[in-house]
């Protein structure tokens, strides 16, 4: 079980230090007088975030007039807190308990684009676990309660007919993907939902891949951009330029001549010791992203259904009302998608 007091204290300190960092960042920006500053938070570290790493390394944001600061946060709730308070303008993430819970409590947030409209990754376990039913009574590593890895895991368990409370499946909040992978490797937890890069690394060490969840028919709204509804309405040009940069990044990723640079960016983003360890992640990235980056209303609705079973406020949310795809529609009319 997660030690709630320790987790709450860590979350409080993380939020405090994060906001102090952003306050200093905004002060420096004001002094410099630079245009179109954007702070984008991200709580995950996997090949799903590769499009961000490449866009930064190749200067695509600056090409489109955006000075973007990518801030890695420990968990989704910290990123949502920053977005809700206006300390950041965008959050990269998937539909989760963190953002749906915040919206249910009054945060006016919307998905403005989605680059991955499916569950992706591996459920990895120690070799003694041979199939999903044997997860009963075991521990699973996650980044945080309510975060992306948690909801990925919950949706997969739901598909398998497993209920954590009934089946005595425990969650342990460990941190980002690299820490979770170490937790499985070292026996701290019995299993975890991991991105393909870390999943392949553990498989090479004898651990079992219980599922490649991309092959399971689970509707989902995956990695995309969230903004405050007011920001989406008042600054559509900024969102448009961020999306143009990310579309340039996708085109760069899919050009075979750029493989060495893409792998280098991915290895750096995933904190891999060797660039060659990003090879599997690179191959996955080639088939990972959507051609049309519309938010997935059905996928959002599926998570509302799951979480709404135990949260009345979330159950009352309407998926279609959590989307503002006006900028994406404009880009499609221009032929960019």
Regions found by a protein language model. Give the residues of each.
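Conserved C-terminal helix/tail region of periplasmic/extracytoplasmic solute-binding proteins
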Residues: 304-337
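N-terminal secretory signal peptides that target proteins for export/translocation
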Residues: 1-9
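Bacterial N-terminal signal peptides
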Residues: 12-24
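Short polybasic/polar patches that bind polyanions
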Residues: 56-57, 62, 103, 158, ...
